[in-house]
Amino acid sequence: MEDTGSIKQEAQSHPPGIFEIPGEPAVVINGVPDEPQTDCMIAKDEPISSGTVGSGEWLEGREVRKFFLGRYYSGTVTKFDKQSGWYRVEYEDGDSEDLDWSELEEVLLPLDTKNSNTNAQSEYGEAGQRVNVKAPYPGHKPEKLVTTTVKAPYPGHKPEKLIPLVDDILTVGPEITSEEVGRAQGIFASADQNNFGLLMAFNFVFTKGEFSGSTVSMYGRNPIFSKVREMPIIGGTGAFRFGRGYAQAKTFTFNTTSGNAVVKYNVYIWH
């Protein structure tokens, strides 16, 4: 957590062990401000490789879309400067600007992977560490569906609902060849009559590595066309017993032909 100001103890306004952080509510457990535990398989000081998200030249050619003064402008990432870490973006109207990664991430469009071998990836995430969820593979049957029938509540409503059953691969990195560390198992279903929102019920099941035998359970609403979607972590087993927290999902790539997507999950768990 970045420092937002000096931490001071107010003996008069707060009991001993209660600390006030300017601009934030005091949250204390045994006299220590509570912070989420976010163990990560990839060390924070590990050098960033050229294949890491937001790391450089491989983003050249990616498309962007920016909202400015009441309209959207489409553009392309044309150059990455290694020394400054800035990305040059040229827009359809002839204008251009230099953006850092945090700014570029805000306008970067999902990558269409329909002509790429990365089709085999469906989800990318971090559940206490960096993991991948991959869907289609040889022998995989994507048409695993539960069909239910409900009474149509309004004209034009489609009574048949399809609920995909998910049993996908968890890997250390986004590459197809990355080491498998577990499975992502669960269901999702359309659960919004007005917008495209899903009900997600997922278990991240770790079968290898430090968290082998442990699971993390995620359950909540996923408005998949929103830029960032937040869902609750409602529990866990093994290393994540009594776990609680939240997950933030962000679409990284989407295949318009197969429907497969790569989604980055940042998961924060108190346990």
From Swiss-Prot:
Localisation per UniProt entry: Secreted, Extracellular space, Apoplast
Question: In this UniProt entry, which cysteines form S-S bonds?
Answer: none
- What are the record keywords, sorted? Apoplast, Glycoprotein, Secreted
Q: Name one GO cellular component term.
A: apoplast
- The segment annotated Disordered runs over 1-22
Predominant cellular place of this UniProt entry's protein: secreted
Residues carrying a glycan: 255
GO biological process terms held by the UniProt record: phenylpropanoid biosynthetic process
| Listed Pfam families | Dirigent, PTM_DIR17_Tudor
Compositional bias per record (Polar residues), positions renumbered to this chain: 1-12
Oligomeric state and partners?
A: Homodimer.
> Which family does this protein fall into?
Belongs to the plant dirigent protein family.
**Primary role:** Dirigent proteins impart stereoselectivity on the phenoxy radical-coupling reaction, yielding optically active lignans from two molecules of coniferyl alcohol in the biosynthesis of lignans, flavonolignans, and alkaloids and thus plays a central role in plant secondary metabolism.
Name of the protein in its database record: Dirigent protein 17
Organism annotation: Arabidopsis thaliana
Q: What is the lineage of its organism?
A: Eukaryota, Viridiplantae, Streptophyta, Embryophyta, Tracheophyta
| Gene coding for it | DIR17
